Curated annotation (Swiss-Prot):
CDD domains listed in its UniProt record: NR_DBD_Ppar, NR_LBD_PPAR
Recorded name of the encoding gene: PPARG
Zinc finger (NR C4-type) residue numbers: 139-159, 176-198
InterPro entries (alphabetical): 1Cnucl_rcpt, NHR-like_dom_sf, Nucl_hrmn_rcpt_lig-bd, Nuclear_hormone_rcpt_NR1, Nuclear_hrmn_rcpt, PPAR-gamma, PPARgamma_N, Znf_hrmn_rcpt
UniProt name for this protein: Peroxisome proliferator-activated receptor gamma
Activity regulation details: PDPK1 activates its transcriptional activity independently of its kinase activity.
Region (Disordered): 1-26
SUPFAM superfamilies: Glucocorticoid receptor-like (DNA-binding domain) (SSF57716), Nuclear receptor ligand-binding domain (SSF48508)
Subcellular localization, as worded in the UniProt entry: Nucleus; Cytoplasm
PROSITE patterns from the UniProt entry: NR_LBD, NUCLEAR_REC_DBD_1, NUCLEAR_REC_DBD_2
Natural source organism: Canis lupus familiaris
Lineage: Eukaryota, Metazoa, Chordata, Craniata, Vertebrata
Superkingdom classification of source: Eukaryota
Function as written in the Swiss-Prot or TrEMBL entry: Nuclear receptor that binds peroxisome proliferators such as hypolipidemic drugs and fatty acids. Once activated by a ligand, the nuclear receptor binds to DNA specific PPAR response elements (PPRE) and modulates the transcription of its target genes, such as acyl-CoA oxidase. It therefore controls the peroxisomal beta-oxidation pathway of fatty acids. Key regulator of adipocyte differentiation and glucose homeostasis. ARF6 acts as a key regulator of the tissue-specific adipocyte P2 (aP2) enhancer.
GO aspect biological process, one term: peroxisome proliferator activated receptor signaling pathway
Amino acid sequence: MGETLGDSLIDPESDSFADTLSASTSQETTMVDTEMPFWPTNFGISSVDLSVMDDHSHSFDIKPFTTVDFSSISTPHYEDIPFSRADPMVADYKYDLKLQEYQSAIKVEPASPPYYSEKTQLYNKPHEEPSNSLMAIECRVCGDKASGFHYGVHACEGCKGFFRRTIRLKLIYDRCDLNCRIHKKSRNKCQYCRFQKCLAVGMSHNAIRFGRMPQAEKEKLLAEISSDIDQLNPESADLRALAKHLYDSYIKSFPLTKAKARAILTGKTTDKSPFVIYDMNSLMMGEDKIKFKHITPLQEQSKEVAIRIFQGCQFRSVEAVQEITEYAKSIPGFVNLDLNDQVTLLKYGVHEIIYTMLASLMNKDGVLISEGQGFMTREFLKSLRKPFGDFMEPKFEFAVKFNALELDDSDLAIFIAVIILSGDRPGLLNVKPIEDIQDNLLQALELQLKLNHPESSQLFAKLLQKMTDLRQIVTEHVQLLQVIKKTETDMSLHPLLQEIYKDLY
């Protein structure tokens, strides 16, 4: 058991999924290139892994599922740290995919261009304060999210502008005695009552301060909000500490965060735009422009492109399994579960997590590849011969809907932990402790979503529904693999993936 996690997957003599889990977290090892994405999108074959894919040494027959001694797994140190961190906010952007024959790029035209800070990994709109997962100040007039301290009160951009226009133009509205309720959706219906509400909450043209909320006041309000939450629910402090711990582990385990990926997709980085691969010619051109980790020159490959892309996905999946396994070990209580149950949870959970995180690399037109250096179009992937052309389309369909939820990395960190700790997986020996851990994670997720997305009251329920969708995607993926097993007799699966797919749905 002294081998490292990386060695257990690269060495052709070590192909057990349990070996992957049993690698000691106390050792400082280099598993994979820390700049690699954590989902299967680097298309190509690694020279080190070619022996594992040898058609004679490994067939498509699935090897028996085995377990090993997990005594080397060390429990990660878990500190109860107050949860305080600025989270990324991702807006909706239009992606204008501009394809050129020899110079391809992704052109983005956001309605309100954000700027990207590599240091803080934040998206910030020019007219908004940086998002904070605990910062949910409401407009005193309509209840919408306040953009700052305007005319003496916390107000949104809409009410600030309404009050300014009314005062500047000296507008007089028709009297209304209905005392209309002013909220986000109705604020434009009765201008008289809206202006009266502005005055009632204290908006004044003579207010000393207006504009963005002062940092000192923001910190004070943040402390008050945290204190109020903790007083209402004493357990919330522990839940926020758990969320902070999971986020930190997430950042360490997965080198390419959603914030970084979306920055690349929206062109808000100092790096050059990713090279667009949309046909065979651009694929060949891409080999000269993109530093692929796994790929060997197309001219030197005897296998067709569809098979090479499929095999490249396999090796990226293997790396993703490594990263997900390390993250799972950081979930409080996971390493204390029955050792066979740890293997079962990962066996069933890894691909659901891979497709969850793959969505961050996707838009409706394509997917980032090779650490964001390239962008392979959806149409090109669909054009591959069957059954290979059918593999990615369900993932794109899921990604478009999943990305509409506008989750950020702090949300995803908890969500993937919930996926791992699913107590209804087949073959579990001791379900109760698994369900106890997941219950705690679900509470942390619900609190996180309420604080981070106060305007989306149904987000928690919608997100749980996505877990069902993910299982269906994995089921369809396994079915396609069975088709390949019958039609592509000269192909083989990576041994680790063979073990994972055995008896999976």
